[in-house]
C-alpha cells in the first residue's frame, strides 16, 4: 500500500508535463535564470511573461508588466502586450488571445455588455453577428436557440437563418434597390435619346422634292406657302389643294428643256448669221486688194491678173476650137496680161 502513493504522484506529474505546451520541467530550480511555477515546477526564465502559459497553473503569466500596446483603436490588446485581436472578438466566448485575456472580466465591463451586443443567459456578452452562426459562442448555447433552420430538399445541409442578422444589413438592401432604379432610368433615357437622334436623321435625309410639296396626313394638310394657294372644300372628296398660276409657272420654268432646245443652246453665235454674198467673175477681176503672186523668175503678179489671164485663155480657146494648142492664139492674151497687172517690185 505504501508503494501506491509515490506511484500516483509520478503518474500525475507525468500527465501534467504532457498537458503543458512546454514540458521541459526540471526539479533543479537553483539554476540561475529559471522560473519556479506555483506548483513547484521550474521552467526556463525566458518563458516567463512571453504571452504563452507554460506553467500548468499559468503562474508564469501573472503579475507581468503590461507592455505598451501597439494595437490600433479598433483592436483589442492582449494582456501580454504582444498580440492584438479584432475588437469585436472581445468576450465572444472564444479565447482569441493566447493568454485568454480577451474573455476575462466580460460581465463586469458595462461597455462590453451594452445594448448593441447580445446578452447570454450566463452573463456573457457577444457580438450580434455571432447569433445563430452554428457555433456555441455563449458557452450555454443560448445564442443558438430560437433559430429557424431550413433544410433544402436533396441538399443534405442545414442552413441557419436569423432575423437579427438581417436587421443589420438594411443599407445593403437599399443600395441594391437604388442602383437598380438608377440603372433602369439611365437605360430608358439613353434609348429615348437614340430614338430622337434617329428620327432627326431620317427627317434630314428626306429628298428635296418631297420637302417642296405639301404633305397630306389623313385629313391634315401641311402647306409650304399658305398665302399663295387656293383650297377648295368638297363634301365628297374633302380638302383639295389647287396650285396658283405663279406655282404653275414656277413648275414650268423648272422643267428641263427639250432635245432640240438643248441643241439650239449649244450652237455658236455665228451659226444663225446669213451666208456671205456671192461674187461674179467680173467682180473678181476688179478686186485689186488681193495679195500679189510672185513667180519663180522674180516677177510679181497679183491674184486678179492671174485670174484674168486664165479667163482670157479660156475665152480664146473657145473662139478658136480648131487650134487649141497654137502659139498664135495663146500668145496674145499672155502678152496682154502682164501689161495690165505687172507691178514693179
From Swiss-Prot:
PROSITE patterns for the chain: LDLRA_1, LDLRA_2
Disulphide bond pairs: 29-42, 37-55, 49-64, 71-84, 78-97, 91-106, 113-125, 120-138, 132-147
Keyword annotations from UniProtKB, A to Z: Cell membrane, Disulfide bond, Glycoprotein, Lipoprotein, Membrane, Receptor, Repeat, Signal, Transmembrane, Transmembrane helix
Principal localisation: membrane
UniProt cross-references to InterPro entries, sorted A to Z: LDL_receptor-like_sf, LDLR, LDLR_class-A_CS, LDrepeatLR_classA_rpt
Matches recorded under CDD domains: LDLa
Segment forming the signal sequence: 1-17
Pfam families per record: Ldl_recept_a
Assembly, per entry: Interacts with APP precursor C-terminus. Interacts directly with ITCH; this interaction promotes ITCH auto-ubiquitination leading to its degradation. Interacts directly with NEDD4; this interaction promotes NEDD4 auto-ubiquitination. Interacts directly with NEDD4L.
Protein name listed in UniProt: Low-density lipoprotein receptor class A domain-containing protein 3
Organism: Mus musculus (Mouse)
